[in-house]
């Protein structure tokens, strides 16, 4: 879990990557926070995607989340701390970096698969929507919870959702902000 940074401090690694027979499995490993996205996770995920996208032996990228959630969205504590510190530019930078990471997934020449075994909320759902395929289980639940408090999906989720599932399903997901079971989403 720890990555040696040479002369620098040790950093905790939240992204585990393995390659087997051309399939790169990229696991977001922050189960204590339900794999919530923060600055470090987004940065490390971007680095991991750069590495596997550049590896000619890789033909498929599988995204997974450790523990009970795929990704439970953005880390709310990050936003609260930044707002309290009047550091709104940090939130803007985080969002811009999130767009870059999702664009790396969406534009990858590799086949991309989100293995959504558990919750895929907010930014986690947006991450899944940036992949070519989303595979769920009976435990899988999708939701844009931010819409229930008047915040729109900030990483392109409303646009990707409409392209993949159609406008009626995207409207339901974005306007209602309700949980959708994985089985229900297969209808869209």
Residue positions per predicted region:
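Hydrophobic/aromatic residues within transmembrane alpha-helices
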Residues: 26, 63, 75, 127-128, ...
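Phosphate-coordinating loops and pocket residues in cytosolic domains that bind phosphorylated ligands
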Residues: 36-39, 72, 81, 175, ...
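Crotonase-fold acyl-CoA enzyme core
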Residues: 104-188
């Amino acid at each position: 879990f720890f990555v040696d940074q040479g002369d620098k401090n040790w950093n905790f690694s939240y992204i585990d990557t393995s390659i087997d027979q051309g399939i790169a499995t990229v696991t977001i490993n922050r189960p204590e926070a339900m794999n919530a996205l923060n600055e470090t996770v987004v940065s490390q995920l971007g680095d991991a995607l750069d590495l596997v996208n550049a590896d000619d032996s890789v033909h498929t990228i599988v995204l997974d989340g450790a523990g009970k959630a795929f990704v439970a969205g953005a880390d709310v504590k990050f936003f609260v701390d930044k707002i309290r510190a009047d550091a709104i530019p940090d939130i803007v930078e985080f969002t811009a970096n999130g767009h870059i990471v999702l664009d790396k997934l969406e534009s990858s020449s590799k086949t991309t698969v989100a293995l959504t075994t558990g919750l895929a909320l907010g930014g986690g759902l947006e991450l899944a929507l940036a992949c070519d395929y989303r595979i769920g289980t009976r435990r899988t639940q999708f939701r844009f919870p931010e819409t229930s408090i008047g915040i729109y999906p900030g990483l392109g989720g409303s646009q990707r959702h409409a392209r993949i599932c159609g406008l009626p399903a995207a409207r339901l997901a974005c306007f209602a902000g309700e949980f959708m079971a994985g089985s229900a989403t297969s209808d869209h």
